[in-house]
Curated annotation (Swiss-Prot):
One of its GO terms (molecular function) is structural constituent of ribosome. Disulfide bonds: none annotated. One of its GO terms (cellular component) is cytosolic small ribosomal subunit. SUPFAM superfamilies: Ribosomal protein S18 (SSF46911). Part of the 30S ribosomal subunit. Forms a tight heterodimer with protein bS6. Belongs to the bacterial ribosomal protein bS18 family. This is Small ribosomal subunit protein bS18. PANTHER family: 30S RIBOSOMAL PROTEIN S18, SMALL RIBOSOMAL SUBUNIT PROTEIN BS18M. NCBIfam families: S18.
Amino acid sequence: MSDTQDVNPATRRAAVGARRPFYRRRKSCPFSGPNAPKIDYKDVRLLSRFLSERGKIVPSRITAVSAKKQRELAQAIKRARFLALLPYILT
């Protein structure tokens, strides 16, 4: 017989749980730092990086933008939409 059938399932689970936990590196805000771009409603190319393919504003937990800069970014996107620089929805 094979040796794998003789192993206790509890010890197998313990061996699997003993692995090192997955470490996800914390992303930094793209608008923080010395060479960071300024958020401007006229910079359509920068603003469109933070819109989904449907035209919705991507949440900060995905883009790693800080809370303060996320509010500025949302305001700039809304201004650009109002001035017809960005679409409200993409079809």
